[in-house]
UniProtKB/Swiss-Prot annotation:
Keywords tagged on the record: Chaperone, Cytoplasm, GTP-binding, Nickel insertion, Nucleotide-binding
Location in the cell: Cytoplasm
Function noted in UniProt: Facilitates the functional incorporation of the urease nickel metallocenter. This process requires GTP hydrolysis, probably effectuated by UreG.
Organism: Rhizobium etli (strain ATCC 51251 / DSM 11541 / JCM 21823 / NBRC 15573 / CFN 42)
Protein's name according to its UniProt entry: Urease accessory protein UreG
Principal location: cytoplasm
One cellular-component annotation, GO: cytoplasm
Coiled-coil annotated spans: none
Subunit structure: Homodimer. UreD, UreF and UreG form a complex that acts as a GTP-hydrolysis-dependent molecular chaperone, activating the urease apoprotein by helping to assemble the nickel containing metallocenter of UreC. The UreE protein probably delivers the nickel.
Length: 203
């Protein structure tokens, strides 16, 4: 499925604790039998997320690369994506038949975006636990990502979040751009995200 332009590069961003690594794990497990998949994770001072994905057996360890960004994690996905582009180039060299590379950003704020030179498709993950007002706060991740994932919907009753309000606000803020509610712990919403990637990414 490798295109002439190389593998489909999917950027996964969102605040700390929103569920980016859980989403990356679920997507890898859902797609690895049909596609050649790899992951690049971004952490400021460690490769903890990459190590977590290896422990979760999301993919073989040679398909998971962790980069230490230092400083502000958004710089490595936006202003200067060199470290990530180099990691992808290394994966391409080792695994020439790659179809999809997931690029998981370090936890960041609502203003974080991926450089178009780095990601073909962007997914932004927020958590119900961050408050029902998060969708209406806006920011590029909320309004301009190709897909918004509102995760941990199962916890809404425990944190006083109204999913109907979040649905309404997300619809208003994103206009025609899609979003999905998910519960990564149970895998709820994963199939919708995979279908989105297949359709939008031409897989």
């Amino acid at each position: 499925m490798k295109s002439r332009n190389g593998p489909l590069r999917v950027g996964i961003g969102g605040p700390v604790g929103s569920g980016k690594t859980a989403l990356t794990e679920k997507l890898c497990k859902a797609m690895r039998d049909d596609y050649s998949v790899a992951v690049v994770t971004n952490d400021i001072y460690t490769t903890e997320d990459a190590e977590a994905l290896v422990r979760m057996q999301a993919l073989p360890s040679d398909r998971i690369v962790g980069v230490e960004t230092g400083g502000c994690p958004h710089t490595a996905i936006r202003e200067d994506a060199t470290i990530n582009l180099q990691a992808i180039a290394g994966l391409n060299e080792r695994i020439p038949d790659l179809d999809v590379v997931f690029i998981e950003s370090g936890g960041d704020n609502l203003a974080a975006t991926f450089s178009p030179d780095l990601a073909d498709i962007t997914i932004y993950v927020i958590s119900v636990c961050q408050g029902e007002e998060i969708p209406r706060k806006g920011g590029p991740g909320i309004t301009r990502s190709d897909l918004l994932v509102i995760n941990k919907k199962d916890l809404a009753p425990y944190v006083g979040a109204d999913l109907e309000v979040m649905d309404r606000d997300a619809t208003r803020m994103r206009a025609s751009r899609p979003f999905v509610f998910s519960d990564m712990k149970r895998g709820d919403g994963v199939s919708s995200i995979v279908n989105f990637l297949r359709e939008q990414g031409g897989l």
